[in-house]
UniProtKB/Swiss-Prot annotation:
Molecular function terms, GO-annotated: serine-type endopeptidase activity
Localization per Swiss-Prot or TrEMBL: Endoplasmic reticulum membrane
GO cellular component entries: endoplasmic reticulum; endoplasmic reticulum membrane
Originating gene: UBAC2
PROSITE patterns with a match to the protein in the record: UBA
Chain's role: Restricts trafficking of FAF2 from the endoplasmic reticulum to lipid droplets. In association with LMBR1L and E3 ubiquitin-protein ligase AMFR, negatively regulates the canonical Wnt signaling pathway in the lymphocytes by promoting the ubiquitin-mediated degradation of CTNNB1 and Wnt receptors FZD6 and LRP6.
Record's keyword terms, sorted: Endoplasmic reticulum, Glycoprotein, Membrane, Signal, Transmembrane, Transmembrane helix, Wnt signaling pathway
InterPro entries associated with the record: Rhomboid-like_sf, UBA, UBA-like_sf, UBA_UBAC2
Protein name: Ubiquitin-associated domain-containing protein 2
C-alpha cells in the first residue's frame, strides 16, 4: 500500500491476513450489533490489579473498541506484512507474542510510575486492542527497512518510502488520551525483543509443534494465492527489459537519496553498503533498443546464484526472475537482495 513489497496482497502472509480479518470483524460486531458486550473487552488495569480480573489482560488487548484505532492498526499491519515474508510466519508470530506479553508488563510499570510521581490514576483505563505489538513493529521497520527518498519539499525536508507509515503511526499515537502509554510500552517491548535483551526471544516464542499445528489447520484458511497479474514498471518489450528497467529505476532512487542527504560514496569494510560497488552493472548495461548506433560493452559472465537463496526469496513472495536479478546485483548477499526487493 505505502511500501512496495515485491508482490501485492497478502501472499505468503497468512498471519497478517488473520490479524486483519478476525479482530476487525469482531470490532465491527461489537460496535454495531453487540455494544452491550463492549464492557467485557475494556482494558482496565485497575480491575486487574484490585479485583484480580486477569482475563482482562487478554480480552482487553485483542479487540479495538474504537473503530478508528481498528482502521489505523489494520493499515499498519498490512504494511508490516513484509516482516512475515522476511522472517516466516513462526518467527513473526513469536515477535508479536513476545512484544504483546512484554508490553503488558511495561503498561503496569508506566501506570505505577504515573501514579507515584504525578498522582494520575485515570490512566489505568487504557485503549483496548492489539495495539502494542503494532507499535513494536516500528522497531524493526526503522532498523532494517532501507530509506529511499521519493521527493524533497521545503529545503531539508524530504518524503521517503517510509514517511506515510510514520504519519499513520503518529495518527494512531494521537488518537486517544492515554494511548501514548500503550505506544511507549510497545516500542520498549519491540526494542527488547528485537535486540534479544535478556534472551526473551528464546523464552517468548512459538514452539515448533504449535507452528506445525497451525500451519496444518489455520494456514490453509488464511493463505492467499500468488498474484498472477503484477503491474510492471517500464514499457519494455520483453520481461528481461522490464526487469532491467525496474533495477535501474531503483538504482537511480538510491543514488538520488544518497546525493540529497550529502553522503559520499566510499568503500568500507564491515560498514555501510557501497551501492556503487553493487549496482554499476545495472547502469552500464545497454539494450539494443536504446544503443543508438553505439557499440555495446562486452557482457560479463553471469554470476552463479545459489538455488537455496532463490528458494528463500521465492518463499517470501518474490518471483524467480526478480530473485535472480537481485542476488546477482548483490553478489549473492541474501540480506541486501531482500532489502532490494522489498523496496520494489
Amino acid at each position: 500500500m505505502f511500501t512496495s513489497t515485491g508482490s501485492s496482497g497478502l501472499y505468503k502472509a497468512p498471519l497478517s491476513k488473520s490479524l486483519l480479518l478476525v479482530p476487525s470483524a469482531l470490532s465491527l460486531l461489537l460496535a454495531l450489533l453487540l455494544p452491550h458486550c463492549q464492557k467485557l473487552f475494556v482494558y482496565d488495569l485497575h480491575a486487574v490489579k484490585n479485583d484480580f480480573q486477569i482475563w482482562r489482560l487478554i480480552c482487553g488487548r485483542i479487540i479495538c473498541l474504537d473503530l478508528k484505532d481498528t482502521f489505523c492498526s489494520s493499515l499498519l499491519i498490512y504494511n508490516f506484512r513484509i516482516f512475515e515474508r522476511r522472517y516466516g510466519s513462526r518467527k513473526f508470530a513469536s515477535f508479536l507474542l513476545g512484544s504483546w506479553v512484554l508490553s503488558a508488563l511495561f503498561d503496569f510499570l508506566l501506570i505505577e510510575a504515573m501514579q507515584y510521581f504525578f498522582g494520575i490514576t485515570a490512566a489505568s483505563n487504557l485503549p483496548s486492542g492489539f495495539l502494542a505489538p503494532v507499535f513494536a513493529l516500528f522497531v524493526p521497520f526503522y532498523c532494517s527497512i532501507p530509506r529511499v527518498q521519493v521527493a524533497q519539499i521545503l529545503g531539508p525536508l524530504s518524503i521517503t518510502n517510509k514517511t506515510l507509515i510514520y504519519i499513520l503511526g503518529l495518527q494512531l499515537f494521537t488518537s486517544g488520551s492515554y494511548i501514548w502509554i500503550v505506544a511507549i510500552s510497545g516500542l520498549m517491548s519491540g526494542l527488547c525483543y528485537d535486540s534479544k535483551m535478556f534472551q526473551v526471544h528464546q523464552v517468548l516464542c512459538i514452539p515448533s509443534w504449535m507452528a506445525k499445528f497451525f500451519s496444518w489447520t489455520l494456514e490453509p484458511i488464511f493463505s492467499s494465492s500468488e498474484p498472477t497479474s503484477e503491474a510492471r514498471i517500464g514499457m519494455g518489450a520483453t520481461l528481461d527489459i522490464q526487469r532491467q528497467q525496474r533495477m535501474e529505476l531503483l538504482d537511480r532512487q538510491l543514488m538520488f537519496s544518497q546525493f540529497a542527504q550529502g553522503r559520499r560514496q566510499r568503500q568500507q569494510q564491515g560498514g555501510m553498503i557501497n551501492w556503487n560497488r553493487l549496482f554499476p552493472p545495472l547502469r552500464q548495461r545497454q539494450n539494443v533498443n536504446y544503443q543508438g548506433g553505439r557499440q555495446s560493452e562486452p557482457a560479463a559472465p553471469p554470476l552463479e546464484v545459489s538455488e537455496e537463496q532463490v528458494a528463500r526469496l521465492m518463499e517470501m513472495g518474490f518471483s524467480r526472475g526478480d530473485a535472480l536479478e537481485a542476488l546477482r546485483a548483490s553478489n549473492n548477499d541474501l540480506n541486501v537482495a531482500t532489502n532490494f526487493l522489498l523496496q520494489h
